[in-house]
């Protein structure tokens, strides 16, 4: 949407000015967050709950590990490490919450959560465990076979998926401009 270039432009300008971005997440409607260095950040129109989590992690001198904002900004997640403990915070569907709680009850530490507005998801744990919705099962399997352990994930509402792995980046159904950069 051409009317949204200004907010995204503000965030990309911030990245260029700082000459770094450790993690970034953008929505289709202009919501965005860029994490730099040890947790410096720029944001535009973040949901208050997500902003509160970012501020709390910084106050506790934690480190933000992973962020996700869905394409329309309805759902979000922040994975952080505070006092050497991995913590997730999210606004997500009940199905995704149930998966996150089930993994935690098994002693799994979540390091990445990617989701869309339709409850499709990829959850990555530090021990290599992956939970995902059926839509991404084949993609996850192919990525692991080709590039090894999955370290982080990103998904789109249109079934697109990017998986960062030990030995490379695997992607499916993403715009060619994004694929060219990867």
What residues fall within each predicted segment?
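Short beta-strand motif characteristic of blades in beta-propeller domains
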Residues: 1, 25-39, 66, 71-84, ...
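Repeated scaffold domains used in trafficking and secretory/extracellular systems
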Residues: 19-24, 62-71, 100-101, 108-118, ...
